[in-house]
Amino acid sequence: MKKIILLSFVLLFLSSCSSDSGSDSGSLATITTTSISETTSISATSGGNITSDGGSAITLRGVCWSINHNPTITDSRTTDGTGLGTFTSNITGLTSNTIYYIRAYATNSAGTAYGNEVTTTTDETMYFPPNGRSATWTTKSIADLGWNQSAVQPLLDYLELKHTKSFMILVNGRIVLENYFNGHTATTPWYWASAGKTLTSTVTGIAQQEGLLNINNKVSDYIGTGWTSAPLAKENLITCKNLLSMDSGLNDALGDDVSPSNLQYVADAGTRWAYHNVYVKLQDVVASASGQTWTSYFNTKLRDKLGMTGGAWIDSGDGLNVYWSTTRNMARFGLMALNKGKWNGAQIINETYFNQATNTSQNINLAYGYLWWLNGKASYHLPQTQLVFKGSIVPTAPNDMFMAWGKNDQKIYVIPSKKMVVIRMGEAADAETMAKSDFDETLWTKISALYQ
């Protein structure tokens, strides 16, 4: 009998004691913590799901976090409403490159219940190199990243075999690899070829954000009529956006000459995708709209702000300008692209335009934005053909990659999910190519071996 009384007392005592309880009425809620998503250097997103209120109303819910295990509401926390169900919590004020432990919580009259613990590591802060040709650029080693050192030499051997002049990998803006081949150096300029189309895309967007032009307006609004040999009604269908998207409807089989006699009507603008150098007319549009030369506007609004010292547009004939720069200058532009138009805290080109530029711009070639190539789409077109190819344009590379591609394998690869920029300059890897080649797939097999 004494044992029964003692046991009853113990059970009564335990039922009245909970480290999170503030009352003896009802039970604690039942809650789970949502997996972490969208982690940056200073923030993350989580949340919770309350499936039972324990018999009394949920008066407070959210997530709490700490650099120690099992955080409680006495640590940092969010407050995200009341009641049952799922909720999302935006966690801010975090420190970069730090491990955090996170739990969802729900408070009712019985106390505070906690969900399972989840962890996240905040990103390293994005680095931007100082301006200047001789500026020191911070590096990060293969070992620091936990990458595969044994995969480096096969990559470099392949690059040299394929007539590469220079190669760089940036992660979070820091140089991981920087290699020069066949007498090329860090100060040697090289041509971008059509990779430079992305410079034109960006500066066109800058001119639009300054109110100088609207890409939805027809090209002739800025440079007058007669810039093509198309009938006037057809010419007036062509907008600046059509030039950005490569769906002007002009004949792409007549070579690089962009004089009016060579810009001939094939289809209405917006109905046919074809890779065409008529995009260069956007430089005339910007010059006319700004009242400056293209070079002056480009240098002031983009080149100088990114510290792309010494880069220059060189007239290659046929009305085309080709950009030349060092490899590091190309990497600077790629780093701005990785940061959606931002450079060291300054928004060079607004993010809305940049997102449009790096997403599908029309419904014909899904792998093309505003003069940017896009990976991971269901199909793609290539220059000089109307064939549709199924699948991702570089299947060995991350699906979220977007690219600036130029003749003879001039490359800027931007991979947001990896916080990575990859640069390749040089002679053609194999036979002369306008943009895509088998080189891309093999190269990305070797790059992926670094981090997989």
State the predicted function of each range.
Residues 13-16:
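C-terminal motif of bacterial Sec signal peptides marking the signal peptidase cleavage site
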Residues 210-246, 290-325:
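Active-site helix/loop module of the DD-peptidase/beta-lactamase fold
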Residues 18-124:
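Short, surface-exposed linear motifs at loops/turns and structural transition points
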Residues 401-452:
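Structured C-terminal helix/loop/strand segments within mature extracytoplasmic catalytic/sensor domains
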Residues 281-285, 321-342, 410-426:
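Active-site-proximal alpha-helical segments within enzyme catalytic domains
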Residues 21, 123-185, 190, 208-213, ...:
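N-terminal leader/targeting segments and the immediately adjacent pre-domain N-terminus
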